[in-house]
Amino acid sequence: MITKSRAVLIVTASLLFGQFAYADDAPIKVNVDNFVRAETASQFDRFLKAYVGGKVNTWAHIRMPSPIDNQTVIRMNRDTLYSAVIVDISKGATLAIPDAGDRYISIMIVNEDHYINKVYHKAGTYDLTMDEFHTSYVMVSARTLVDSSDPADIRKADH
């Protein structure tokens, strides 16, 4: 089940709560020069529509390990809970990662050029800026390790 809140990860953002906006609705020819940006825009758009009703800056959480026959991304791990958000960082944003104790977590930042600028593993507060990530929007993708055979561990990781 996917919901909009989780105590494990919080993004505090001082930004506009809008959707992707395009000045011209005319089709853009995709070619070798713009393919990476176009493919990333397509992936971001699919995520926004499928999980958060088109809303930027809204977390989506997959609260159970992904079944083998229903994976939104190729090769999702069976021992992992996933969370993600598309964040408008044009005016700055902050990622706050709480202490997860011994539990493995990773938070990957993917920019609009499909470049992974950073992967965070430690608790802390991190500024998400265009100087560092080079695009107005990024996907923050979080992974939390669980024992998928233990419902109690899944519940513990998901609170």
Identify the function of each model-found stretch:
Residues 23-159:
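A compositional/structural signature for long, glycine/proline-rich flexible linkers
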Residues 1-9:
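Bacterial N-terminal signal peptides that target proteins for export
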Residues 2-3, 17-25:
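N-terminal export/targeting leaders of redox proteins
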